[in-house]
């Protein structure tokens, strides 16, 4: 029978139906000698008989090695009516290879996904290979060597750009900061009282306090910064508190607070307005918004490491450097640290694991101190506006980091490169087609008769592949073709298949179930 996908082909002695061309079969005489040729009629709807699967000892002439013929009728059963073996008596039963069974649907899906991935991977490889001119074209057109040199240079350039992109990606994983000056302006204005003689009503005296600021421009970066949006003043801080004189404004109205939330909208400054006609002392507390977060160290640990406020990774790195410098690591158990007298006072332990240091540091780290500015709100009418300036150091993202991000996210150049690559691939494909046409015409010009014969043979092979035709029709049309040894077994298989088919039809008609 014909081999199904995923199964091993088993050659039973019973057989499949007939198909194919005309011819004659040999009748068997006494002793198994061939008798005179007997003309066989075709099966209903079929041509003359064609063996579904010749035995291994009798290969059919004109067939390609490994090819199989289409089976006819149901699968073979036993020659008797009560047995269940799948082969005829007297023949050895072939076992099916378990590894060749039909795979489960999940396995089929996995295989299909893997095939898609392999096709995508091969497509990328093929896309690179498609840009290379064949050696034959380079021999015919010497100028094509210039193109190959450019292609080699492009590969080197692509490798260099890829390395740079990887370096930039690694650099962006680390915080890139630069110190800039943040100038804070604190100013106040005084509005004296006004009386309205007609209505008998007026306005009371009041003052207004403004807190605003900006980053000082860097001459080297001013040209680049002019093209990007400026940061709002409030974006530098986590919270702001203005504390007024408690004796003047009472315990419930002397504090003005602002705290950042998830829905906070950034602003360029803060202003506070209160009634009053006397000078007011106020304290402005600014809590910087450190990114990444920074912590103030315990005074003892700060003196030991020489760090006042820093991020957690920097603090752990500094502590590790102190341990290595003073050789405090246990020589036998390297994961332990032997504390000296200073670390014993800080961590209250003589020996600890290095993995315990982050947890032990948690109790020694505190929120950073706020920036405290004392200011006097003047209500002197002669001094309508009084401004004080304060400069503080602020760590901001390096402008180079923004340029790096822009470079990595830029797709304009990639689209242009992809467009040019497509044009190159189309040009190379056209060149290959012209090369094939040239070789076709050149072969015909050198030997027209031999070329036509070879071409017809090639077309004949292609036709057989396209139409799924097997065998050799020229041999099958001759009577000698059916006098070969394989015809005896083919006849038995054909008639046995027909008997089994009629038997099943009869059982279905009579309602007989074969148990």
Curated annotation (Swiss-Prot):
* GO annotation, biological process: chromatin organization; nervous system development; regulation of transcription by RNA polymerase II
Q: Where is this region: Interaction with ESR1, NR1H4, NR3C1, PGR and SMARCA4?
A: 43-167
UniProt-annotated location(s) = Nucleus
- Gene3D superfamilies of this UniProt entry? SWIB/MDM2 domain
* UniProt xrefs under InterPro entries: SMARCD1_SWIB_dom, SWIB_domain, SWIB_MDM2_dom_sf, SWIB_MDM2_domain
Molecular function GO terms recorded: transcription coregulator activity
Q: Which residues does the annotated region (Disordered) include? A: 1-128
- What does the function comment of this entry state? Involved in transcriptional activation and repression of select genes by chromatin remodeling (alteration of DNA-nucleosome topology). Component of SWI/SNF chromatin remodeling complexes that carry out key enzymatic activities, changing chromatin structure by altering DNA-histone contacts within a nucleosome in an ATP-dependent manner. Belongs to the neural progenitors-specific chromatin remodeling complex (npBAF complex) and the neuron-specific chromatin remodeling complex (nBAF complex).
Q: What protein name is recorded for this chain?
A: SWI/SNF-related matrix-associated actin-dependent regulator of chromatin subfamily D member 1
- Which residues are modified to Asymmetric dimethylarginine? 68, 88
Has keyword Acetylation? yes
One Pfam entry for this protein is: SWIB
Q: What is the lineage of its organism?
A: Eukaryota, Metazoa, Chordata, Craniata, Vertebrata
Q: Main localization of the protein?
A: nucleus
Annotated TM spans: none
Q: Which residues form the SWIB/MDM2 domain?
A: 290-367
> Quick one: where's region Interaction with SMARCC1 and SMARCC2?
168-474
Which residue ranges are recorded for the region named Necessary for GR/NR3C1-mediated remodeling and transcription from chromatin? 180-515
Keyword entries, A-Z: Acetylation, Chromatin regulator, Coiled coil, Isopeptide bond, Methylation, Neurogenesis, Nucleus, Phosphoprotein, Ubl conjugation
Coiled-coil ranges per the record? 412-440
Q: Which of the residues bear the PTM N6-acetyllysine?
A: 223
Q: Which family does it belong to?
A: Belongs to the SMARCD family.
> Where does cross-link Glycyl lysine isopeptide (Lys-Gly) (interchain with G-Cter in SUMO2) occur?
101
Per the UniProt record, the source organism is Bos taurus (Bovine)
